[in-house]
């Protein structure tokens, strides 16, 4: 028994050593650069929540004009998401993020400097296209550079940064100019724009393009000089080869109907719940309910990030299906 316990302890130590070896400083830095613009995504979601009255007053907008302005983030997001996979497959995740920043930075600048409804709407639409691209490429990029042992935690950083952005917009909307908040939305985009010069392309995309040597070099850099990447490299190459003959049409085969219905249904029902609209006009909802919007927005800004962390903990403990049933 003593020898058996010793073997188990050694095995656990090896697993922990492997996990810690996989999480290198360069991997953490690369992930930070990739998810940094997710903060801007969150700011975009919360930008109108506490600034509706001041935007309407400054630019003399009607309720209808402001409603169009708010909805353009969603319309732009639909267009960005529609082309995100094609752009990422053709040019790589890194180039897609550069394209994203062109839309996000120009969009935020147009909002911050807007003197009329045209520039305001154009800016919101451009930011929408940017966050539509982000919503696909960021989680995919992270998943393709991280090892399996820490993939879930690293991918969660995308959602965490989004919630941090929402919380920031909610809180600052109580006392700060909507133009300044728009400029704050640019800061993480600039961090990503510069940081992308120092991070590698996705190893999987490099393998798909037939650049196997570059794939190995990038993977070695991400995992550390002493890490054995032979097995992981082979897994990537096999995966790329297997997916080469899979087309979008394959998803609509009868055997995938159940999975496809669940996947699309969950995403569709999430949007039809009205959560996006509620997020855009949270301050107004509080006012109409007779509750001080400043207090409500402040409380929400405090709750948003912890609830995201709680969600991760509950998912890890109980799984996704029970939580969806409770919701």
Curated annotation (Swiss-Prot):
The keyword Transport applies. It comes from the Eukaryota. The chain crosses the membrane at residues 26-46, 68-88, 102-122, 125-145, 152-172, 180-200, 260-280, 295-315. The lineage of its organism: Eukaryota, Viridiplantae, Streptophyta, Embryophyta, Tracheophyta. InterPro entries: MFS_dom, MFS_sugar_transport-like, MFS_trans_sf, MFS_Trehalose_Transporter, Sugar/inositol_transpt, Sugar_transporter_CS. Gene3D superfamilies: MFS general substrate transporter like domains (1.20.1250.20). Belongs to the major facilitator superfamily. Sugar transporter (TC 2.A.1.1) family. PROSITE patterns: MFS, SUGAR_TRANSPORT_2. This is Sugar transporter ERD6-like 9. It is a multi-pass membrane protein. PANTHER family: PTHR48021, SUGAR TRANSPORTER ERD6-LIKE 9. One of its GO terms (molecular function) is transmembrane transporter activity.
């Amino acid at each position: 028994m003593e020898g058996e316990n010793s073997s188990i302890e050694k095995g656990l130590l090896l697993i922990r050593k492997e996990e810690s070896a996989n999480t290198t400083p360069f991997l953490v830095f690369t992930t930070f650069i990739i998810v940094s613009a997710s903060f801007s995504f969150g700011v975009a979601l919360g930008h109108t929540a506490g600034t509706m009255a001041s935007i309407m007053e400054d630019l003399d907008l009607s309720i209808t004009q402001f409603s169009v302005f708010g909805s353009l983030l969603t319309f732009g997001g639909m267009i960005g998401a529609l082309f995100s996979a094609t752009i990422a497959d053709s040019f790589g995740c890194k180039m897609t993020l550069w394209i994203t920043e062109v839309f996000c930075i120009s969009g935020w600048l147009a909002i911050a400097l807007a003197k009329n409804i045209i520039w305001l709407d154009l800016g919101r639409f451009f930011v929408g296209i940017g966050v539509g691209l982000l919503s696909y490429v960021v989680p995919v990029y992270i998943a393709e550079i991280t090892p399996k042992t820490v993939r879930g935690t690293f991918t969660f950083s995308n959602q965490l940064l989004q919630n941090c952005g929402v919380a920031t917009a909610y809180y600052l909307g109580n006392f700060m100019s909507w133009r300044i908040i728009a400029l704050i939305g640019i800061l993480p985009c600039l961090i990503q724009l510069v940081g992308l010069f120092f991070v590698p392309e996705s190893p999987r995309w490099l393998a798909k393009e037939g650049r196997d040597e570059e794939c190995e070099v990038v993977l070695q850099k991400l995992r550390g000089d002493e890490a054995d990447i032979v097995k992981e490299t082979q897994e990537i190459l096999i995966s790329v080869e297997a997916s080469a003959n899979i087309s979008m049409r394959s998803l609509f085969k009868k055997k995938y109907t159940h999975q496809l219905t669940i996947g699309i249904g969950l995403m569709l029902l999430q949007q039809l719940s009205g959560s996006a609209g509620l997020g855009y006009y949270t301050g107004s909802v509080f006012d109409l309910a007779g509750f001080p919007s400043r207090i409500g927005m402040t409380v929400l800004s405090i709750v948003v990030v912890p609830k995201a962390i709680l969600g991760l903990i509950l998912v890890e403990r109980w799984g996704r299906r029970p939580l969806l049933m409770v919701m």
